[in-house]
């Protein structure tokens, strides 16, 4: 608590009562609470005075909304990258933020703002307006922002004359001189661009050899000799463009998750003249493409099965056997087609488990 001897100012000072008898204690007007002892010379607020302060706060809020300047309030904003325009959603629609040169400044309230421009480029002043009728945030006119975005430099309606703002319009001679200077630069740029395009059209010798080798393979649909490729290097763009989408599709397929499922496969080794069957052939889900090859138990050569089928019962043709008389349980180490059934449901390696929790990227 504060000591009674010290004086503390109060934001709502009120004079003392005029009557001597009507002081800080109970009087004829009604029941008044006693003031605190640490604030001598000040009394507490009455109910009516609380209502007046509430009305005053409401009035201040209305004034802050109606007037262009804020009354006892602060404007909040989000800092963005000034080098890059960003679309902002406000009450009047989408607007584009201006660069750092066109921000709210004390000079903006006087009527106009001169943004920072590039070296040698004169821009007309822009009129500052409020974002909304009940907002105190100012911004450059929408028409001026659209003109700047489109490359135009025409003044807006609310602007004054260029001479009054301190800027000077370029004379016709200066405009003609500016237009005449960059013409040779554009021609040189066109020549350079044409040279780059011609260089891109002609593939390097390594690419030509690779394309010729790919097209000369026996598995290709339309073989083309390497001599024709050497004679017409410009025609190689078409096959390269056709090969690029295929490579991108293959890369996408490699990035996708491929689940594996178990199928039944027949194997045959021509060298050893051995034929065997396996019920645990890992194939890509939904296809008959074998992912893991099996090795011959004699010559230990990897072979893919010449035929792959789904693991189903031979009689009922189902993944889980529904026959009234089921065959004996299948041995995971030596699976045979006549022993495939659905009785190994809860086993570690079951015939009816088609999906694998292992996936490859």
Swiss-Prot record:
Basic and acidic residues bias (residue ranges): 168-177
Tissue expression profile of the protein: Ovary. Expressed in primary oocytes (from primary through antral follicle stages) and during the progression from Meiosis I to Meiosis II. The mRNA is detected in growing oocytes (early primary follicle, type 3a) through fully grown oocytes (antral follicle, type 8).
Biological-process GO terms, alphabetical: membraneless organelle assembly; mRNA stabilization; negative regulation of translation; oocyte maturation
Effect recorded for residue 269 to S: In 4CS mutant; abolished binding to the 3'-UTR of maternal mRNAs
Entry-linked SMART domains: zf-3CxxC (SM01328)
Chief location: cytoplasm
UniProt zinc finger (3CxxC-type) residues: 263-346
Effect noted on mutating residue 341 to S: In 4CS mutant; abolished binding to the 3'-UTR of maternal mRNAs
Positions where Phosphothreonine occurs in the chain: 154
Location of Phosphoserine modifications: 161
Keyword hit for Metal-binding: yes
Stretches for region Disordered: 1-23, 98-128, 148-252
An example molecular function term from Gene Ontology annotations: RNA sequestering activity
Pfam families: Zn_ribbon_3CxxC
Superkingdom: Eukaryota
UniProt-reported outcome of changing residue 161 to D: Mimics phosphorylation state; does not regulate formation of MARDO membraneless compartment
Gene deletion effect: Mice are viable but females are infertile. Ovarian development and oogenesis through the early stages of fertilization are normal, but most embryos from mutant females arrest at the one-cell stage. Abolished formation of MARDO phase-separated membraneless compartment and mitochondrial clustering in oocytes. Mice lacking Zar1 and Zar1l oocytes display delayed meiotic resumption and polar body-1 emission and a higher incidence of abnormal meiotic spindle formation and chromosome aneuploidy.
Free-text description of this protein's post-translational modifications in UniProt: Phosphorylation by CDK1 does not regulate formation of MARDO (mitochondria-associated ribonucleoprotein domain) membraneless compartment. Ubiquitinated and degradaded by the proteasome during oocyte meiotic maturation, leading to MARDO (mitochondria-associated ribonucleoprotein domain) membraneless compartment dissolution.
Compartments where found: Cytoplasm, Cytoplasmic ribonucleoprotein granule; Cytoplasm
Keywords (A to Z) from UniProt: Cytoplasm, Developmental protein, Differentiation, Metal-binding, Oogenesis, Phosphoprotein, RNA-binding, Ubl conjugation, Zinc, Zinc-finger
Coiled-coil intervals, chain numbering: none
Function in brief: mRNA-binding protein that mediates formation of MARDO (mitochondria-associated ribonucleoprotein domain), a membraneless compartment that stores maternal mRNAs in oocytes. MARDO assembly around mitochondria is directed by an increase in mitochondrial membrane potential during oocyte growth. Promotes formation of MARDO phase-separated membraneless compartment by undergoing liquid-liquid phase separation upon binding to maternal mRNAs. Binds to the 3'-UTR of maternal mRNAs. Maternal mRNAs stored in the MARDO are translationally repressed.
Family (UniProt): Belongs to the ZAR1 family.
Quaternary state and interactors: Interacts with YBX2.
Free-text note on domains in this protein's UniProt record: Disordered region at the N-terminus undergoes liquid-liquid phase separation (LLPS) for the formation of MARDO (mitochondria-associated ribonucleoprotein domain), a membraneless compartment that stores maternal mRNAs in oocytes. The 3CxxC-type mediates binding to the 3'-UTR of mRNAs.
Annotated protein name in UniProt: Zygote arrest protein 1
Naturally occurring in which organism (per UniProt): Mus musculus
């Amino acid at each position: 608590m504060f000591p009674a001897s010290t004086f503390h100012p109060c934001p709502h000072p009120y004079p003392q009562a005029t009557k001597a008898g009507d002081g800080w204690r109970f009087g004829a007007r009604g029941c008044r609470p006693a003031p605190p002892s640490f604030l001598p010379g000040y009394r507490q607020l009455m109910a009516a005075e609380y209502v007046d302060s509430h009305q005053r706060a409401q009035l201040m809020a209305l004034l802050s909304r109606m007037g262009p300047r804020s009354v006892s309030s602060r404007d909040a904003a989000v800092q963005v990258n000034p080098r890059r325009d960003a679309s902002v959603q406000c009450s009047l629609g989408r607007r584009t933020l201006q660069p750092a040169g066109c921000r709210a400044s004390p000079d903006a309230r006087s009527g106009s703002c001169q943004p920072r421009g590039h070296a040698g480029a004169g821009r007309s002043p822009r009129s500052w307006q409020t974002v909304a009728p009940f907002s105190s945030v100012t911004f450059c006119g929408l028409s001026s922002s659209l003109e700047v975005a489109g490359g135009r430099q025409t003044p807006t309606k609310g602007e004054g004359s260029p001479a009054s703002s301190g800027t000077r319009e370029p004379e016709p001679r200066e405009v003609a001189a500016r237009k005449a200077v960059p013409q040779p630069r554009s021609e040189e740029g066109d020549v350079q661009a044409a040279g780059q395009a011609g260089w891109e059209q002609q593939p390097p010798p390594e690419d030509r050899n690779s394309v010729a080798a790919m097209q000369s393979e026996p598995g290709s649909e339309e073989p083309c000799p390497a001599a024709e490729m050497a004679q017409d290097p410009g025609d190689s763009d078409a096959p390269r463009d056709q090969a690029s989408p295929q490579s991108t599709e293959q890369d996408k397929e490699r990035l996708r998750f491929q689940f594996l499922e178990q199928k039944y496969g027949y194997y045959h080794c021509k060298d050893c003249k051995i034929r065997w069957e396996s019920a645990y052939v890992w194939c890509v889900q939904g296809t008959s493409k074998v992912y893991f090859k099996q090795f011959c138990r004699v010559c230990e050569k990897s072979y893919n099965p010449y035929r792959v089928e789904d693991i189903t019962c031979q009689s009922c043709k189902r993944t889980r056997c529904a026959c009234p008389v089921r065959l004996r349980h299948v041995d995971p180490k030596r699976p045979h087609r006549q022993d495939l059934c659905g009785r190994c449901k809860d086993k570690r390696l079951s015939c009816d488990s088609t999906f694998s929790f292992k996936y490859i990227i």
